[in-house]
Amino acid sequence: EESERYPNVDWVDALFKDYAMSYNANVNLSGGTSFVKYFASVDFLNEGDLFREYDNSRGYQAGFGYNRINGRSNLDFNLTKTTVFKVNLSGSYGVRKTPWDYSDTDYSAWISAYGTPPDAMLPIYSDGSFGYYSKDEVGASNSVMSVALSGAEERTTTRINTDFTLEQDLGMLVKGLTVRGLFSLDNTFI
């Protein structure tokens, strides 16, 4: 077929979608009594993939994506008229999907989308094989093949943040004097 022998590829169109969806939803709850005030929040974030999806016949979908859920809870207990105990808990769980062994500084797919000549090869030929340019002297790499065949990696990150505060108003001894003790613990698991 002539289009396979003499390709004219818009690599940006072949590699990227017109747009990527991103959304964020959250729910907050607050209230309290004379003894306790509370605030709670849950948030979900989804970042879609800008790269087009191609069948790689390997049983997985390569590409990019990110999902994260956050939670927060703040409780303020009025133990006495002059003593307040505060508990603040927050955490998140995130999953980042990338092609296997992809780093944050790897821009090769972007570079080749704008640098590969339109007549170098087709992204995918009619027999299902990916285009390949044997001499890479002109920077002709097939980013469609790279993204589709590079595997898929999911990196999870879990964060837990806590702080506990005890405040004692000593205004009865010295006007405006308050003593505060704070304990906090932050953990990140990757």
Q: What residues fall within each predicted segment?
A:
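Short glycine-enriched, charge-decorated loop/helix-capping segments at active-site entrances
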Residues: 55-61
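Short, solvent-exposed loop/turn segments enriched in Ser/Thr/Gly
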Residues: 159-161
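Flexible loop and strand-edge segments within Gram-negative outer membrane beta-barrel domains
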Residues: 3-43, 47-51, 62-141, 153-156, ...
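Short, Φ-rich (hydrophobic/aromatic) sequence segments
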Residues: 175-177
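Membrane-embedded beta-strand positions of outer-membrane beta-barrel proteins
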Residues: 40, 87, 164, 179-183
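Surface-exposed, low-complexity/disordered Ser/Thr/Gly/Pro/Asn-rich loops and linkers
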Residues: 145-148
